[in-house]
Amino acid sequence: MLLTHTSSRWRTAAVCALAATASWLPSVQAAEKTQADYFVSSLPGAPEGPLLKMHAGHIEVDAEHNSNLFFWHYENRHIADRQRTVLWLNGGPGCSSMDGAMMEIGPYRVKHGGHLEYNNGSWDEFANMLFIDQPVGTGFSYVNTDSYLTDLDQMAEHMMIFLEKWFKLFPEYENDDLYIAGESYAGQHIPYIARAILNRNKNQNTDPKPWNLKGLLIGNGWISPADQYLAYLPFAYQNGMIQADSDSAKRVEQQQSICIQKLQDGGHDKVDTSECEQIMVAILEETKDRKADRMNQCLNMYDIRLRDDSSCGMNWPPDLTDVTPYLRRPDVIKALHINSDKKTGWSECNGAVSGHFRAKNSVPTVKFLPELLTEVPILLFSGDKDFICNHVGTEAMIENMSWNGGKGWEVSPGVWAPKQDWTFEGEPAGTYQEVRNLTYVVFYNSSHMVPFDYPKRTRDMLDRFMNVDISAIGGDPADSRIDGEKGPLTSVGDHPNSTKAEEDKAQQLKEAEWKAYYRSGEVVLVILIIVACLWGAFLWRTRRSTSLYKGVDGDEGRESLLTGMGLDNFRRGARRHDVEAADFDERELDDLDDAPKKPANGYSNVNSEKERQPHNDSTFSLGADSDDEAEGSERGRRKEHS
């Protein structure tokens, strides 16, 4: 009895345990997010028509410190020969990639009043776009306030965790050709991430499949700090900001001498050297016009054609006055699935992130850029009116760097890669240079954020770099020429109704039309055979009936039989059935073929927006900076390399 009672107890306990487990499992499963949890079903202010396919939200990269990275993904509008994904990062460190999404290369631009317009030049034409706010704490990303990152290897590790989880959520993109692009301080982020991906690909003992990293694009990049620091004064001379041998020049040269000494004392191996950063600060001080009104006293460090208040460009670009309130709207926050753990509103740049991210244990990416060039093509591009990460510094870095068996622009001993003129739609656009897996593009009359000024030109650059050829798709390619020669036919958007999908639809319609004709003929033939058989049977029965009843009812018997068998009704029914069997008649096919076709991507007015023109000075007279978290010198640093 005791054993039986004990056994019964254990059975009861086991049943209870199983029941508890069963009730617990669904809650665990519910915690696992799926694609559907990230799907953006509506976006406030979006243009009329079908919404672009997009996903957005947070992915946890470190549970211990509540570290979550925010992403916003747009599916490509068209596919050329294969699938491609471009991962975009802005700089800072600590500046949101929503700058890229909403002011540069994303499909929408925010207008006054919070409505969105299509960006004629967005990069989602032939590539899926993945914008990520990183490091943690940047933009919509968040982390415990005592857990901000400090070094570039930490950032790369977080990005690898993010990508592993993201590709698990969206496996259909894992085999895409992958490109990583960005600007400014992303010149540090991108090579570190690329190196981590390449190392992962080589370690196939633990990782399931390699990621197809195909190229890197870096605009006005902070790659070689030493070359950039020593380029500030030459750039100022070239652009007439400071006159050589003037008192101003002598004061700046004195600060440059201090910088050179610091570089010789180990600064070449550092990402930031504060004594060298003071060179740019000194030039901005020397070029201030203290007699001008308050909003025009200082040069804009991001676009020297413009002037600003004493923040010297921190209020730029002007679209911030519309982007910031839009991204802080409750309905937008809800649409983008922003977690409730994100306690503060969106800000362009986070001073706390920048203040912690000093990269003291990191080497500048120029140190291993040559190694990357042996495995991955790299494109560097520069707006020629940017001061903070100017083209003079980038060109000095290239000339001083050795990779793939040569130094700088040397193709062979004594032979250098030519600088080729680039024209776009009949206007001088810049120059191209290519050598040993490196491409360098200079954009004329452009700022620190080149896509902000010339989205269509930058997408032409992207499509060339990705070797996109739209000859199999249709559409009207851009008139883009390097040294007078047209390259591959690449799209710049003005063909939403001329894609391969539309052509396939037209071909399918023609095939359906012929099938309908053929099917109609078959149906008619079958019906005629049936009618003939019935008619034969009818005649046989009629003759038989007539012979039996003739002389009794005269001809009335035949008439009554015709009516009684309902042959007239059968003919009418057969005619209706014929039309239904073929689904539609020729007139309906003609109407279908002549009906106007709507683009599958929902772009109704994508081509109406003209390319942005250079802004005048008054355009940039804005209010306070978007970041409320930093002041003084820290405020200057946090967006120093945005």
From Swiss-Prot:
The active site is at residues 184, 386, 448. InterPro entries: AB_hydrolase_fold (IPR029058), Peptidase_S10 (IPR001563), Ser_caboxypep_ser_AS (IPR018202). Glycans are attached at residues 120, 400, 437, 445, 497. Residues 476-500, 586-642 are annotated as: Disordered. One of its GO terms (molecular function) is serine-type carboxypeptidase activity. It comes from Phaeosphaeria nodorum (strain SN15 / ATCC MYA-4574 / FGSC 10173). This is Pheromone-processing carboxypeptidase KEX1. Residues 632-642 have a biased composition (Basic and acidic residues). Residues 31-519 are lumenal. The keyword Membrane applies. Its EC number is 3.4.16.6. It holds the Pfam family Peptidase_S10. The gene is KEX1. Gene3D superfamilies: alpha/beta hydrolase. The keyword Cytoplasm does not apply. Protease with a carboxypeptidase B-like function involved in the C-terminal processing of the lysine and arginine residues from protein precursors. Promotes cell fusion and is involved in the programmed cell death. One of its GO terms (biological process) is apoptotic process. Keywords: Apoptosis, Carboxypeptidase, Glycoprotein, Golgi apparatus, Hydrolase, Membrane, Protease, Signal, Transmembrane, Transmembrane helix. GO terms for cellular component: membrane; trans-Golgi network. It is a single-pass type I membrane protein. It is an enzyme of class 3 (hydrolase). It is found in: Golgi apparatus, trans-Golgi network membrane. Residues 1-30 form the signal peptide. Residues 541-642 are cytoplasmic. Belongs to the peptidase S10 family.
